[in-house]
């Protein structure tokens, strides 16, 4: 899922990356909403709330929303910076480092929320900020790896792109190319798995509370392990062939 980027990627690799990261984003967003009463991937909504607080001159809330937005931006910036820095050595290494950082951040959220969270305003703001940083990392990573095709938490853009792709597919004067078909498959996969993750997040939070945040790092570890398994199998095959 992380070994190749952009045009080198197969449909299978894009579908696997889209489904796993969209599932993780859906779980995180809904669990964050239930736990902290804030959508942790809804940057558009946070900008709207920021504008509202500016109008109402709620200075503390203005600072909070600015920090949240900056943390999402920081996650996206860091992810892209790391990928560009390590791209010349190994695609897998360049793409896996942001995932490892995301796992660490979400484990912090899971451990703190499950064991120490006492529902104070400051704790809530710090945890939401941490999740937004992690989602910035993930969004930037999958977008960069897929050449902008996959954005697992940006559903407004997803519906816009999906509408355009389906219009192109059904238009009588447009060619029904494999590229357009594959884009539709990927976008529908993101939508379906994000919705599934959101449903799972809502149901499981009632049962296991903050322990649900342990599930997302497990999904991300599976993404890392999937590519490591393929790399090991290829090395084994080369040894056998020799």
Predicted feature descriptions by range:
Residues 2-242:
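Alpha-helical transmembrane segments of multi-pass membrane proteins
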